[in-house]
Amino acid sequence: MVREVAKFEKVSFEQFLTDMKEADYYYKQVGGQSLFGDAESDAEIVAKVREMYDNIKLPTRATDGSAGYDIRSPFDFVLNDKIKSILIPTGLRCKMDKDFFLSIVPKSGLGFKYGLALANTIGVVDSDYYRAENEGHIMDKLTYESVLCNGKALEVQAGMGISQGILLTYGITIDDYKTEKQTRTGGFGSTGK
């Protein structure tokens, strides 16, 4: 029996704007054009990011039998022989039951056709990440392997599916209660420090 255990939401506009500026900086460092197009002034950048934010759609399953919720890119981008990775602030977070996590995996078609993968191979979004300093903002870092597609560039349009989120349950060890746990305060990657 399938249970309803989670709810996708958008992060605040302010969080999305902060993370988009970081992603734009990273993309330009690896040779990409600005994710903000020809916007130059702060006001133009805010307006461009507001448009992206307003168009973010919450993840959905394509069919009744689909396990994955399609996560879409909020902006256009290109990956090719020169630009091999990108950080994508999705604008999303996920509130879920304590004994679940959200697994983030690449869309299989993009993996087969373009060698697209997540930089960390699989994303794990813990249930307590929802309350992190960055509002639990789910971000995908995608990498592109041109040798797998004969150098064909991957051109992604805003709204195109880039990854999938799959809700999974997990167990704990019998002696787990003996280990002192920390409370999550940081954002992305903060519990491994």
Where are the language model's segments positioned?
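DUTPase catalytic domain/fold
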Residues: 1-193
